[in-house]
């Protein structure tokens, strides 16, 4: 069986299983097994698929049919043009979160500063920001030790030196230092949300997704605590659910933040809300 036929059959299986991107999933999985990119697959589609690699590929397709995320199956995900290692201990970086990086860069025009990423996971946000602002000191924290180890390894593999990653339950392990910009993509899904039973999120850590009855528990905690760690004039920017923007703005305003505003993601949904402390 040649590569084109193998991909076509796999894509059909994935489509029947409910994948929203069956051909892409198949190409990414086969490219991973063969150690090639998707362009190579298009160019050499008439080549015979090696038996051993074919067996490995079909095992991955079977796992994907069961719903396992592609990023976990191949152990990597691209974010902001950076290739990041992933694991089941962390949330899978998503394209919409690049909106938070874009906002952070707009809020950080200076050559130097101090940046904090709360709940860093793979280190995606911290590393994307650090790659664009090499003069900034970038800190990422996560309460999961495996996540901190993974983020550290990603920084090393990408040769991004202006970062450090610490184990901390939100701010608990930080000293009296202050930051010019604090960002977070915290858990913001309500416990009863039916989407938790669908798609990739079924396999992602619940601790990175769920935040109480209304999904706002961690956002409230961050808003209340961040002021003590922001330098004068510093910003707090947070990702949240598309239907939470108004409530997050209210929480920021009630806590005393200024210049509160929400920004939209790639789909046109309000996804990031920010506020500033007094100078």
Enumerate the language-model features and the residues they cover.
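Conserved beta-strand segments of alpha/beta enzyme cores
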Residues: 83, 137, 162-164, 258-261
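Mobile active-site "lid"/loop adjacent to the S-adenosyl-L-methionine
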Residues: 188-218
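Conserved AdoMet
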Residues: 28-106
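Conserved SAM/SAH cofactor-binding pocket of Class I
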Residues: 95-198
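Non-catalytic accessory regions of SAM-dependent methyltransferases
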Residues: 1-40, 49
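Conserved Class I SAM-dependent methyltransferase catalytic core
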Residues: 213-276
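Residue-level signal for inorganic ion chemistry
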Residues: 29, 67, 97, 125, ...
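Active-site beta-alpha loop architecture of Rossmann-like, nucleotide-cofactor-dependent enzymes
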Residues: 71, 189-192, 243
């Amino acid at each position: 069986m040649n590569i084109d036929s193998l991909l076509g059959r796999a894509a059909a299986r994935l489509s029947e299983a409910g994948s929203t991107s069956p051909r892409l999933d198949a190409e990414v999985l086969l490219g991973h097994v063969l150690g090639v990119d998707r362009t190579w697959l298009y160019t050499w589609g008439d080549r015979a698929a090696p038996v051993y690699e074919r067996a490995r590929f079909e095992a991955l397709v079977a796992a994907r049919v069961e719903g396992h995320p592609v990023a976990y199956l191949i152990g990597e995900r691209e974010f902001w043009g950076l290739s990041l290692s992933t694991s089941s201990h962390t949330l899978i970086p998503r394209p919409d979160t690049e909106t938070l990086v874009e906002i952070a860069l707009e809020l950080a025009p200076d050559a130097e500063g101090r940046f904090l990423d709360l709940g860093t996971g793979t280190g995606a946000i911290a590393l994307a920001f650090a790659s664009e602002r090499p003069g900034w000191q970038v800190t990422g924290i996560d309460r999961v030790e495996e996540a901190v180890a993974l983020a550290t390894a990603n920084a090393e593999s990408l040769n991004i030196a202006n970062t450090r990653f610490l184990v901390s339950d939100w701010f608990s392990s930080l000293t009296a230092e202050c930051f010019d910009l604090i960002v977070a993509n915290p858990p913001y899904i309500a416990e009863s949300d039916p989407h938790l039973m669908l798609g990739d999120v079924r396999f992602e850590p619940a601790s990175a997704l769920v935040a109480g009855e209304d999904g706002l528990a961690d956002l409230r905690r961050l808003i209340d605590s961040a002021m003590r760690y922001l330098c004068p004039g510093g910003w707090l920017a947070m990702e949240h659910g598309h239907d939470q923007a108004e409530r997050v703005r209210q929480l920021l305003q009630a806590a005393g933040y200024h210049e509160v505003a929400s920004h939209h993601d790639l789909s046109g949904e309000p996804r990031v809300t920010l506020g500033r402390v007094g100078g």
